[in-house]
Amino acid sequence: MAWGFSDIPEVVVDYVRGVFAAANDKVSRAMDVYPSMHEESLDHLLIMELTAAPPAFFANERIGVAIESHWLGGRWMWHRWEIADMAFFVILRRHGHLQIRKVALLQTKRLYSREIPVPELERADFEIGIGRIADRTDPSRPLSTRRQFTFDGGCVYGAIHAGDHQMDAIDAYFDDRGIPVYYGFYNPTWLPYSA
């Protein structure tokens, strides 16, 4: 019998939502403490939190569930474009046999504070991906300099806006493959926020 989403017991859905909510909370709290944290570090923190969630067994439903996460950042997935930063798999088994596997691709963007300029990105930033960080030569502030970070409704998510080439590539990927790519937005636990 083929399983659909409606066949997944509510207790399992609640468990998976809880694991993702706890991981999201951990990442948001990291932005509270380290407001200038790089997006890639936030990606790794999210993956670490999800990976740390052990598989769970629901005795009444006789179902085991595991969540697997994989970082994809920097990989060319579509015509030399990075389409997603990470992939998640939610796997349900009964008596050791696969019942259903759900896959989600996630493209993440972080909210930039008023004090951190949103970097001007070039096409190569998306084509090369994370490897582009090694090319940076821009000056940085001394670590001993005190800084203020303010997040409010006027802040923007870096590298995402209507008509953006990366967003166009993600849309084309979906049209061709039929695999949706979701957007994850990193921000502090509340707005406005200042640290």
Q: What are these model-derived regions, one by one?
A:
Residues 1-6:
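Nuclease-adjacent, charged terminal/linker segments that flank catalytic cores
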Residues 11-70:
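Acidic-basic catalytic patches of nuclease active cores, encompassing PD-(D/E)XK
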Residues 34, 87-90:
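A structural/positional concept
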Residues 55, 111-195:
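Acidic, metal/cofactor-coordinating or nucleic-acid-engaging core segments within structured domains
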Residues 66-82, 91-93:
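Active-site metal-binding core of divalent-cation-utilizing nuclease and nuclease-like domains
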Residues 81-85, 101:
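Short connector loops at helix/strand junctions that flank enzyme active sites
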Residues 86, 104-110:
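Conserved catalytic cores of phosphodiester-cleaving nucleases, focusing on short active-site segments
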Residues 93-101:
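Short, solvent-exposed loop/turn segments that connect beta-strands within catalytic domains
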